[in-house]
Amino acid sequence: MMSYDVIVIGAGVVGSAVARELSRYQLKAAVLEKELDVACGNSSRNTGMLHAGFTYKPGSLKAECAVEGNQEFDQVAKELGVPFKRTGKLVVGFTDHDRENILKYKAIGEENGVKGMRMIDKDEINRIDPNAGGEFAMYVPSSGILDPMQYTIGLAENACQNGVKFHFGQKVTGITRDEAKDVWVVKTENDTFETKWVINCAGMYASEISEMLGYPNYPVKGFKGEYYVLDKKAGKFLSIPVYPAPNDKGGFSTHATPTVDGNVLVGPDSYVTEDREDYVVTKEHMDGLFRDGSKMFKQMKREYFIRNFAGIRWKRYNPETGEILDFLLESDDAHPHTVNLVGIESPGVTCALPLARRAVALLVKKEQPQKNENFDPVRLVKKRFHEMSHEEQMAAIKENPLYGEVVCRCETVTKAEILDAIRNPLGVCTVTGIKNRTRATMGRCQGGYCETRITEMIEQEKHLAPEEVRYSKRDSYIFTGKVRDVK
């Protein structure tokens, strides 16, 4: 049986942020994740937006953490080597009702402490970005864009480098209390762990873990949203996220958002689902994204579409009124040595570190652990080959000839970079894991050229048979066997 001072359940963006905060202290900490890598759930299935905090109820945990997370992110991105651009955001409108709602949420944002928001006319929209839709808009300068996969990976790798242990493929099946030893016994499909503290960061499964810890199985509702990914050709025409006016409840419909790597995301829409992992996309919703996205982004063309995907936000709600509730972060003596986080959805990426600090502070207040004097907040990241100058590329190839072998032609990812990703600090290795660390397979051909080459490199580096290589999740085996021998 493996024993720890604290176990975090879930390695999404919040769980990884909690792990990093724990590594600031002299604690034996671990993270249990049911999948084979970090960011395998909705931490990788979102817009990658750094939210400003103008649609959340004043005084709510969402509002406090969104504003706090937004204000600190330049420094966080620098420490972790995470791509980030403070682009600002346009919240555009077409009707008088749109204007009323925008002004309503502008006032809420100001009450929450969001700085610099202002109303602009169509001429100024065109000066900011001529391809943005709208007759008028609210300009929000503090918003930004980031890569949520890279951010989650950065948090987790920094935590790992500072001493936190990550256990992957460990789906939690039960948690019991051993009062005699003053510990929790956490059982997974594969192992048993013993820990004094448990922090629940299980995302869409947080309600089930909550119940295992003795808290309520809080009602949650799934809101699914579908997306288009547009080619980098489209990215040349959009420099700022363009959102429609929020609805009466503060929700947004389809928007157009440039990514830090030059693509454009169009979506999400929103509809209720009961399936926690229903990531299928549908023609009906894709057609709706094209229609609504064209209002936000004037250069919307089907020829730019290279991929689609879906994400699901599991929101805590009141079953009697249907009201969507605030993030829940709780800890009490009736459930000793636990911190319970439930209903963490958008803006979870923006709020991850502020939530983590609050969660870890509850443990620190009780335990008074010594600080980790060797904690290093900086994660060293190599510059991507395609971002290097010609002189830098030649120097890199001279030092390591594998930089001269391009594996992914669309994104110019080299063999040296693929091998670095395979040898990552977390020790994880799937095709999607390589994709999220390098952008290989994310280009126009979506892996048509490089995916089999990456698979072969994984086989060789990890000493796996082809049938053992997985695409992303636990059962996502790519190959089932040989068709024939090639001579």
List each model region and its residues.
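N-terminal Rossmann-like FAD-binding beta1-loop-alpha1 element of flavoenzymes
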Residues: 4-31
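Flavin-dependent oxidoreductases
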Residues: 17, 175-182, 187-267, 271-280, ...
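Glycine-rich FAD pyrophosphate-binding loop
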Residues: 24-44
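Dinucleotide-binding Rossmann-like beta1-alpha1 core, especially the glycine-rich loop
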Residues: 48-128, 134, 251-254
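Short beta-strand to alpha-helix junction loop
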Residues: 58, 62-67, 92-101, 139-157, ...
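Helical element adjacent to the flavin cofactor pocket in flavoenzyme catalytic cores
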Residues: 139-197
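C-terminal catalytic lobe of FAD-dependent flavoproteins
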Residues: 148, 260-261, 272, 277-406, ...
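Local cysteine-cluster metal-coordination motifs and their immediate loop/turn environment
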Residues: 405-418, 438-456
